[in-house]
Structure formats: structure tokens, C-alpha cells
Amino acid sequence: MKLLRFLVLSPSGIKLDKTIISAQVKTTEGYIGLNFNRAPLIAAIQSHLCKIIFADQTKREAIIGAGLMLIKKTEAKIFTENFVFADEVDINETLKRKTELERKIHHIKDAKLNVKIEQNLMFELLKLSSKKK
């Protein structure tokens, strides 16, 4: 079985660089499966819970923030500011961050900044929902 190189990149660096069997990613058009030899694609992605099967058959879920995805036959890259594995989420830190973002969103009048805050709030809510499973 041929494997796909899966990278998650952010302004702060490489968040993930592993070979995978498959991953399920949510684009603005819906979920798509990633695996080796997939047709090339560039797509916007939404904040979502991504299911990944790694080359060693282990399965993990990750919360990925909104961003952009570039797929080639042998490689998939996701460009996002937010990425964390679901099993590494700190509930207390996430709740503090959520409260802070909710406070900010009510006081900011700048539409562009509000969109950014909404995206970050969505990411924090996904982190919390992943822990309720």
C-alpha cells in the first residue's frame, strides 16, 4: 500500500509531517477523503474534527482550524493557524480561551477582526466538543 505524506503548516511552523493511509478533511463543499494517488485539488477548509489513519495503522483525531488545502498525488498540505490532536486538548485552558474570545467578540466593532475571533472561537468549541465523546 502506498502512503500519502500529510503536512499541517502554520505561521508558527510545521505542526504535522507524517505519512498516512488516509484522512477525512472538511472543505467548504463537504468532507473528502485523502489517500495516495488522489486527484490534485486546492480547496478551502472549514474548522473541523479530522480523522487520520497513520502508516502504522494508528488512528487519531485532530482539530484543524479554517485554512487552505493543497493536494497532489503523493502529498497533502494544509495551511492553517490552528491545529491540535484531540487527545492533547487541555479543557481548562480551552475554557479560559473560549471565555476570553466571547468577551472580545462583544466589544470589537471591526468586522475583519470579528471574523478572526469567530474562527478562533469555533476552533475552541471544536476542542471542547471533541472531549465530550
UniProtKB/Swiss-Prot annotation:
InterPro entries: ATP_synth_F1_dsu/esu (IPR001469), ATP_synth_F1_dsu/esu_N (IPR020546), ATPsynth_dsu/esu_N (IPR036771). GO terms for molecular function: ATP binding; proton-transporting ATP synthase activity, rotational mechanism. F-type ATPases have 2 components, CF(1) - the catalytic core - and CF(0) - the membrane proton channel. CF(1) has five subunits: alpha(3), beta(3), gamma(1), delta(1), epsilon(1). CF(0) has three main subunits: a, b and c. It holds the Pfam family ATP-synt_DE_N. This is ATP synthase epsilon chain. It comes from the Bacteria. It comes from Mycoplasma genitalium (strain ATCC 33530 / DSM 19775 / NCTC 10195 / G37) (Mycoplasmoides genitalium). Belongs to the ATPase epsilon chain family. Produces ATP from ADP in the presence of a proton gradient across the membrane. The keyword Membrane applies. One of its GO terms (cellular component) is plasma membrane. Transmembrane segments: none annotated. Keywords: ATP synthesis, Cell membrane, CF(1), Hydrogen ion transport, Ion transport, Membrane, Transport. The gene is atpC.
